[in-house]
Amino acid sequence: MTSFSIDRATYSVGESALVDMVLGKPEFPEQFQGHQVIREGPLDNDALAENGFEGTTAERFRLAGRVTGVMRELGPTSNMAMSDGFDFMAASVVHLFDSPDSVHGWMHDIFLKDFEDRVGESVGQGHQLVSATRLEPQGFFDESVALKVLQGGVDGLISSTVVDFRVGRLLGVAFIGTVGDHERLDQVMQLGQALEKRMVSVVLGSG
């Protein structure tokens, strides 16, 4: 299966197929099976803008070619200790765009650029964006990029390791949030590759 044929196949994917692409809780790594689903379902441009950086608008996302998305996020239960090195959160997200070129543009001009441009700024909830470090993800079918994002607040440091990867006009996102200053690239790549496999199986009609 070539990247061109995958690209072409994603044009027949409708919004309703996205819900079958995000990983279910049993498909997340073993360390997250005791976590709970804290957010899941559709993620339209309005919702994404509300949860994004200050000043971000749904119109900006529409102009970037984003149609909609679906996500599932796991978080800690109340009895979990938020100690240093604890992976408290994990998520898989699938975004639908109008073209593969728009996916590429989003990865570089919105995902990477927005984080890197806002280092040192407040990111809400009393947190400051301390650093955004590019990582080198491997093992994906097409283009992929990754960041380790470090935030600081009154409760200390929180790290997010995020990978974005392209499957035609779809963008897959996997991320893990960790207490303290820690990188989780290997685990995020594992999560992302499971998501990629699921996305491709749905695109090709076997999901």
Question: What residue spans do the PLM features occupy?
Answer:
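Short, surface-exposed beta-strand/loop micro-motifs that present aromatic residues
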Residues: 76-82, 159-166
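Surface-exposed amphipathic alpha-helical segments
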Residues: 175-207
